[in-house]
Amino acid sequence: MTELYIHNGRDVSGAPVAVLITDGVIAEVGTELTVPVGCPTLDAQGCYITAGWIDDHTHCNAHAALYYDDADAIGYRTGVTTVIDAGSTGADNVADLYQQAHRAATNVYALLNIARTGIVAQDELADLNQLSFSALRTAIQCYPDFIVGLKVRVSKSVVGDNGVEPLRVSKQYQADLTAQLPLMVHIGSNPPELAAIIALMRPGDVLTHCFNGKPNGIVNSTGEVAQYVRKAYQKGLIFDVGHGTDSFSFRTAALARTAHLFPQTLSSDIYYRNRLNGPVYSLAVCVEKLLLLGYRLEEIIPMITTNPARIFKLTHKGQLCRGYDADLTIFQTVTAPQIVVDSTGEERIAPTQVIPTYSVIAGRVYTCGIDK
């Protein structure tokens, strides 16, 4: 039996919290626990303890040509215990990503790109021959515990002259699959117009890059969130941040917050270049940006734990509860103002730094920023 006792921490409300882990599973959670003699301990003094962070929009296919990274570099080393690769691979090459996932310490899952080759070029959906229901279904049947959703990119640079046709086909494929998988939809430059995209989306679909500052975004020419966007949100359209190199605007995010349109999930859209050169850097930096916009830590943590676990049916993750996987993130917050920048180049002062200290994955402790 492998055990670990983590103590002297606090939850995001500030209440004391301690966690006993047995054989990779959370055995007990409380303020102070009775533990077996000789049980290894980890002192979390001065730190928050939460369920392990989940980044539901990353690009961690190390073999990809355009958007690539190492799962552990964007995962446990930055306080993230679970990453979901958002469409780097399709039916033709998801097997390779699956093999990479098994070599990582970080939990890795995949959203299968509707294009069978995934993102091998920027315009993977300019050719509709990339779409194959039989190939998609076979891949999902081969990796049912690895593929947790579908991904379609619907912007001019991706679809070429095909407009919303790839999205229409994606919705048909989604309906025809035996597996009930969520669909993440990337938005960006037009055509197609955002209104035409959202018209095809349904409650439970995930709109990623929701706070981009592009002309084809959620904010209309009068500086308000478009009415059709509000209606879709109220009916259950899921907002995912998907920060990325080009897809997060402080102004758009602030306007949405004023309109009470809050993201259900906070994701980074991280890959090698925007991790090293910004503006993303890490999921923790994305947390800092929502904090500066006025979100409270108690509002943000569910966006990177409970909510993505529910949406993508990671049934034993996302909660600091008995019986759940022993995936935890231990982190500090420090009042230390710093300049942060969005995808439009706008700089703002973030008053709080979020510093991950330890990632715990299946009961094993990893020091953030340190290699295995």
Model features per residue range: what roles?
Residues 1-50:
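Histidine-rich, glycine-flanked metal-binding segment
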Residues 9, 24, 46, 57, ...:
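Divalent metal-coordination and catalytic microenvironments
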Residues 44-103:
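Metal-associated gating/positioning segment near the N- to mid-region
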Residues 64-73, 129-140, 191-197:
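Short, acidic/polar
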Residues 78-84, 88-89, 103-128, 151-158:
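Metal-cofactor-binding active-site regions of metalloenzymes
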Residues 152-256, 260-277:
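Active-site core of metal-dependent hydrolases
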Residues 251-333:
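His/Asp/Glu-enriched, well-ordered alpha-helical/loop segment
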Residues 325-371:
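C-terminal cap of metal-dependent C-N hydrolases
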